[in-house]
């Protein structure tokens, strides 16, 4: 599914004009990007959590040559699906599940 597909779904299901649907989708994604760029977590109930984690500098190996190389410190985006989403994907009953803040066990400096 692409961003254009999401806009089309919003247009068809909510009845906004295509321009309004596009602006809404852009606003949502811009907000998510800004929050994540600021290092904050995004928790979407029934869907999952997006978390920016810090990765420390480390030594790795070039798989072709075996040569050791330095891998710079960086930030990575991780996604952890909610229990509800996992159950839905596996065709399991999910009405009894509650969303939990499962992201508290992330190690920010792996």
Swiss-Prot record:
Q: CDD domains from the entry?
A: IHF_A
Biological process GO terms, please?
DNA recombination; positive regulation of metabolic process; regulation of DNA-templated transcription; regulation of translation
Q: Where are the transmembrane segments?
A: none
Q: Return the GO cellular component terms, semicolon-separated.
A: cytosol
The keyword DNA-binding appears for this protein: yes
Q: What's this chain's function?
A: This protein is one of the two subunits of integration host factor, a specific DNA-binding protein that functions in genetic recombination as well as in transcriptional and translational control.
Stated family? Belongs to the bacterial histone-like protein family.
* Protein name per UniProt: Integration host factor subunit alpha
Question: Gene behind this chain?
Answer: ihfA
């Amino acid at each position: 599914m692409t961003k254009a597909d999401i806009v089309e779904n919003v247009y068809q299901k909510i009845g906004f004009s295509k321009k309004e649907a596009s602006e809404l989708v852009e606003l949502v994604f811009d907000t998510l990007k800004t929050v994540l760029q600021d290092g904050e977590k995004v928790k979407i109930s029934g869907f999952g959590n997006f978390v920016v984690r810090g990765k420390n500098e480390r030594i790795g190996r070039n798989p072709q040559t075996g040569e050791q190389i330095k891998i710079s410190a960086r930030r990575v985006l991780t996604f952890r699906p909610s229990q509800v989403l996992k159950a839905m994907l596996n065709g399991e009953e999910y009405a009894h599940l509650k969303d939990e803040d499962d992201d508290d066990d992330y190690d920010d400096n792996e």
